[in-house]
Amino acid sequence: MTTVEHSSELDEEYPVLAEAVERLRHDGFVKLPGVLNPATIAAYEPEITRTLFERNTQTLPLEERSTYYKAFLQVTNMWPHSEAVRRFVFSARFAKIAADLLEVESVRLFADQGLYKEPGGGITPWHADQYHWPLSSDRSITVWVPLQGTSREMGPLSFAVGSHRLELGRNIEISDESEAAVQAALDAAGLEVEDGPYALGEVSYHLGWTFHHANPNRTDTPRKVMTIIYVDADVRVTPPVNPAHFGLLEHVIPGAKVGGLLDTPGNPVLWPPAAAS
């Protein structure tokens, strides 16, 4: 395991302007410039990458995978396996932004995910994350942190503007079917899609019911992304109603009790930070 010198930037506050909060309310997502400086990314990226490949279980070549598994290498809950990854995921900077944008006093960790879209990796089908989560509230948000500048050719995350306010596609798991059905619904609703590149250090936050997608990686460089999912600290676990819920309760939030707070050891409060120290 590589030793990574801790970056104080991860503990420092980032000013969240009222305009950003309003944009999240209206659009369902917001992109924030300069959340991390290049030195912080350069310090943590190698250990995040090492941990992802150490924990990765996908061994099939791209051409033999389903659409979903062509989208990226995905590893969930990396933080228990690396002290450097834990510091990155437990960042007070990221967590306070999440609380400010959600307009709640406190947020806890739901899960982290490394999402590495390989060279030649396919689309990430349209989907809304919260379909997969048995939660009592829609106060959930994900920070999407590219570990390099991300051009359109690499397949940056794209968002259907305002889709979190529409009752569409909320019963569809991420799949070929969700790609077709959600795209048709978005076209019918006339929603704009934001699919711009990300500068190095820029991140995005999106709500659990915001529909998002990514195009293929048409470059010869992996699109390396770390994500952290936050929920209102007062959220409760609801009875599972679809296969994704059952799998998540078993593998992602083990120990969570239906009807109870999501207060397992794997779901610490990250803002305010004293509870996570």
Where are these regions (language model features)?
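Non-heme Fe(II)-dependent double-stranded beta-helix
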Residues: 1-26, 33-126, 132, 171-172, ...
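Non-heme Fe(II)/2-oxoglutarate
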Residues: 2-5, 9, 58-63, 172, ...
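Active-site region of the double-stranded beta-helix
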Residues: 104-105, 130, 135-136, 147-156, ...
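Short, surface-exposed loop/helix-turn segments at secondary-structure junctions
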Residues: 128-129, 176-190, 222, 241-248
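Short, conserved beta-strand element in jelly-roll/cupin
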Residues: 134-152, 197-198, 205, 229-233
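Double-stranded beta-helix
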Residues: 150-211, 215, 235, 256
